[in-house]
Amino acid sequence: MARPRIFVADDNPAFLRELASLLAAEFDVVATATDGRSALDLIRRYKPDLVVLDLAMPVLNGIEVTRELAMSSSSPPVVICSVETDPEVVEAARKAGAAAYVFKIRVQKELVLTLKSALQGKPFVSPSSIQ
């Protein structure tokens, strides 16, 4: 069976490399971007199975990219990965169409599990965000 194709965007190049490296063991990372506009263009071009987006990116933020993708019927599941832990922000991401939300501090423990859940259509939010 083919490995799921994933796209990753984060405005921090070092964290972006770390994410791509972490995910490469189980997914094919087809492309990466450091801003929201480039992310949108590359997602439309490569048509990945999953998308991981930072929340705070230049040009378009993760919620704006998610909202834009959600307008398409063929949109892949989007997982927001952010340092932002405010429950209102988590809810805004969900309302924009995000399938899941993972805190960056929990990436090592939760991201792969979250992505597998998103592929199966199951929502996931970092347990520490549920209060």
Pin down the residues of each PLM region.
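Active-site beta3 strand of CheY-like receiver
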Residues: 46-52
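Receiver (REC) domain active-site loop signature in two-component systems and cognate sites
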Residues: 57
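Acidic catalytic/metal-coordinating carboxylates
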Residues: 35-38, 60-64
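Two-component/phosphorelay signaling modules centered on CheY-like receiver
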Residues: 13-31
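C-terminal output helix
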Residues: 88, 106-119, 123, 127-129
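Short amphipathic alpha-helix used as the core "switch/output" element in two-component signaling
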Residues: 41, 63-74
